[in-house]
Amino acid sequence: MNAAVLFSGGKDSALAAVLLSRDYEVELITFHFRPGQESGEVTAAAEALGFPHRTCVFGPGLLSRAADMVIACGFPNDAINMVHLSAVTALAHEYQVVADGTRFNDRVPRLPRAEVQRLWNRYGCSYLRPLLGYPKAEVDRLVTRFLVVSQGETGSIGNGDYEREIRAEVRAKGHDTGTFFPGHHEQSLVIRKR
């Protein structure tokens, strides 16, 4: 059975894919807000993992709504959760199994139990979070066992994280992203498997 894994190119989604590959035919899926936003680094990360990879584009207007939500709320959490739910829902139309790399202590993205149940009731889709029981320290230990990654500040690494494009849209709307997004947020990019 195929499992679509939402893939940013980072260590969490990569580790989720590796763990799921024991039981599923993993396909890595990266979402962007506009056509042509594909990242060569994310494609290279997918190739290094050895899983099929494709990119999808969100419907029009979602990026602007997400940026407006960040500005209105004063923080990105609700916007990132909205975008993540949009990605999972889009894939639920195609796949019986959709997964991501959310961990035990992640605040975002985090889908509430009611949304997960709705995905099953409406689409017959299982939403898997293979890292949900793992705290960050344990994820990092497993990553060092299975993957080689580079790390850096948000925006300095060419990954497929939603936040990068949302930050750019907030800036395009004339706002300082430092007002809304936490400083010193480190992200990762897979270089190769061990």
Which residues fall in each region the model found?
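Nucleotide-activated chemistry modules centered on ATP-dependent adenylation/adenylyltransferase
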Residues: 1-5, 9-194
